A protein has these predicted regions:
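Extracytoplasmic "Venus flytrap"/periplasmic binding protein-like
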Residues: 1-45, 74-85, 176, 183-184, ...
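A structural signal for short loop-to-beta-strand junctions that line the ligand-binding cleft
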Residues: 3-6, 10-15, 41-75, 105, ...
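Hydrophobic residues within well-ordered alpha-helices
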Residues: 1, 90, 97, 175-180
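Extracytoplasmic/periplasmic solute-binding protein
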Residues: 53, 58-62, 67, 91-139, ...
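Hinge/lid segment of periplasmic solute-binding proteins
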Residues: 17-66, 82, 91, 117-120, ...
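Short, solvent-exposed loop/beta-turn-alpha elements that line the ligand-binding surface or hinge
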Residues: 32-46, 106-112, 128-149, 197-208, ...
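C-terminal lobe and pocket-closing loops
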Residues: 190-205, 216-308
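Glycine-centered hinge/linker elements that transmit conformational signals in sensory
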Residues: 93-96, 136-166
């Protein structure tokens, strides 16, 4: 996206962005503030859809996402296990499932080395109450007790997962679930539609239930981040082009008919959206006070470093302190 938007005129007039991907676009001054266009043509857009950064509207969000728990109701019931609300309970439940002989690797999350693994660290660190950078600076602030506790929990969960967990992204763990190998899973809310459709084993589909994200370490906010998807407008395009693009996309991002027709395809931020069963994870995350993924200029670099540096700790080749020091 960056090269396409850097061209003058840019190759696209709009770019779909999220919490993390908007930061490089802003850092390089590639997208334009939308305040005037919102005032003029944003009648159907709700205030909650406006992504405001440094006092300027830089994006219009249309859907929300988060990672939360999925569980097999039948497996938990058979073993008398309550629905886990904390990661400590997820570990205990997974150990009980393994001990019963029902499943050898009862837990799954997207631990693929790189972006996915780093996202799991981000979620767990936030759940422990961590702050990624020292106040008012770009200096990392993860090599501490909260960082170590985060890594130790990720390690415990990885030991209850398929041994190939470092290659497993969201699609791979979805396949594990649909194959009946997993009873507890942390996965994106946006993936719930394909897990609850009519295409897989009907018994697994029927037993697949959704709940909110887990907390960790005695914390009271979820070990999860809230995400938004929305549209931004390219700076390197004529004003008339930006205006026409905004009008078209603002119509789409406030279209009540679309929201009604596609109510179970996403958690829409559009007025008139009625949440269905597939939205429960995001709705619960919001109720529990989940924090948004940090929109900080330096967060991209940290995310990239985390995805590679904590692999050796999970493989038992490095201490938690050394892994965090390497970030």
């Amino acid at each position: 996206a960056v090269p396409a938007l850097t061209a003058n005129p840019s190759e696209f007039s709009a770019r779909i962005a999220a919490n993390s991907s908007i930061v490089p676009l802003m850092n390089q001054d590639l997208i334009r503030p939308l305040d005037d266009l919102v005032k003029k043509y944003g009648k159907g857009i709700q205030d909650s859809q406006l992504i405001t950064i440094d006092g300027k509207v830089m994006a219009v969000a249309f859907m929300a996402n988060t990672q939360h728990l999925y569980y097999r109701e039948d497996v938990l019931k058979d073993l008398g296990i309550a629905i886990p609300k904390t990661y400590e309970e997820v570990v205990a439940a997974s150990e009980k499932i393994r001990a019963s002989g029902k499943m050898q690797y009862p837990y799954a999350a997207a631990y693929k080395a790189g972006w996915n693994l780093a996202e799991e660290f981000v979620n767990m660190f936030i759940g422990h109450g961590g702050e990624f950078f020292k106040s008012g600076s770009a200096q990392p602030n993860i090599n501490n007790a909260k960082g170590v506790a985060t890594l130790n929990m990720l390690k415990k969960l990885s030991e209850l997962s398929n041994p190939d967990y470092l290659t497993h992204d969201s699609e791979a763990i979805k396949v594990e679930w649909e194959s009946g190998n997993v009873a507890l899973m942390t996965l994106w809310a946006s993936r719930s539609g394909t897990l609850l459709d009519d295409e897989g084993d009907p018994n697994i589909t029927k037993a697949t239930k959704l709940t909110g994200p887990a907390t960790v370490g005695g914390g009271n906010i979820p070990a999860a981040t809230l995400w938004w998807d929305g549209f931004t407008l390219a700076k390197n395009r004529p004003d008339a082009d930006a205006e026409a693009t905004f009008r078209a996309l603002a119509h789409a991002a406030s279209n009540k008919k679309m929201v009604a027709d596609a109510a179970d395809q996403a958690v829409w931020l559009v007025e008139g959206f009625v949440p269905g069963p597939k939205s429960i994870g995001v709705i619960e995350a919001v109720k529990m006070g989940a924090k948004p993924y940090p929109m900080l200029p330096q967060m991209g670099l940290m995310h990239g470093a985390l995805g590679s540096e904590i692999v050796e700790f999970l493989q038992g080749k490095e201490s938690a302190e050394q892994a965090l020091k390497d970030v």
